[in-house]
């Protein structure tokens, strides 16, 4: 018997092509969350900025994307799911082109914000559209396709970013979106019009949205600029901190009292949701901070090319792809708190392994923690998502999922900023301590006896001290993140035991 599709115009080859276009669009957006990670040293070198400033290229995209996630439902209801999807694709493609043309950090960050704002709605809308064009009995396969692109994107991102940066230039990590974006836009306009949703006049919480942008923007600016401006010795950093704190409090009060809040914070009344999202945010912040820091350390200290840094970073992909379906099945049969706790503590152990990395570590010594991390990530991500969405009422699932994704993305941006800032700050402290304890004359004499000139010895010593200081600082960051993972793994036990493990929705 032939399966009836929701839309007669979308069946057979056209349905498969439409699904491919939607999945490819999601893949392109997800890819851009990690493709720039290994290219940061190339970008900072080309634009003559510090590594801390270079990280803004990653965090600006993540923050802009996070801000747009809560607006997706309103945009789709007001203008139509397909229209918003196509408009987002067009904007994402245009801003990708502009990112490639950028010749200053300010321009690049500005265009990355535009890219994130346009790309933010594409991920949830791609999920919605796949569910919409496939019949009910094919929804599992549709979500499998969506999940595959969501998982594969971050794995291929570092590899593609490294290959492109080494063999072409960093500009091409953005230019490669052009042909993909144009094809997806044209195909979506041709195929998806029939799947358009009805539009209704919806009120938007403009005050809440403004407050959200205000406190998030102030917080991220404080984290990104704090290092350069000597933190709270700077008036501007104090102003940003006060703006973020006051803005957050006013935002909470407003959202709790508004009839149509941009973010439904009332779902935090469910203890299971509040605790699981806290653990998820802590875990993802430490995870994303690590994967932003590692490629930079490899290239700065171990003389890895961007390509090889990408290969090493991507070794975690095998475990993630292998374990995701297994963990999804285990989550229906076992207490997800135990699975999540196991995953988070395993991530803590893996990150602790990195805290003992040295400048003479070989590829496999560096790759093993990455491989083990790949196996651990599904254990914390899938069960925590299930606990969170299984703790709220049926009618609250959509807003809870949006809020969870928003906080996860924000935690990633904050984690990346903290990682690079602490790394840079502690490197200066470590260097100062090493220099004060270094017997320079003895080292110089040893180098002179080995044929080095007097002029070159100081440069060699300085370079060695810098490398060791940067590595010690990276070890310090990994130790802090290991503690965060373990703390999150213990906190999850404060969640009430799920009443029906098998009945919880997966995400």
Question: Predicted segment positions?
Answer:
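Structural signature of transmembrane alpha-helices in multi-pass secondary transporters
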Residues: 29, 61, 65, 92, ...
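Hydrophobic transmembrane architecture of multi-pass small-molecule transporters
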Residues: 2, 8, 183, 387, ...
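Helix-loop-helix hairpins in multi-pass membrane proteins, especially solute transporters
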Residues: 69-208, 225
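Small-residue (Gly/Pro/Ala) motifs that create kinks and tight helix-helix packing interfaces
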Residues: 40, 153-165, 415, 419-423
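Cytoplasmic loop-to-transmembrane helix junctions
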Residues: 53, 138-145, 396-403
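Transmembrane core module of solute transporters
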Residues: 13-73, 77, 82, 96, ...
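Helix-loop junctions on the cytosolic side of multi-pass membrane transporters
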Residues: 186-206, 253-262, 429, 494-503
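Membrane-embedded alpha-helical segments of multi-pass transporters/permeases
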Residues: 97-101, 182-190, 249-253, 352-356, ...
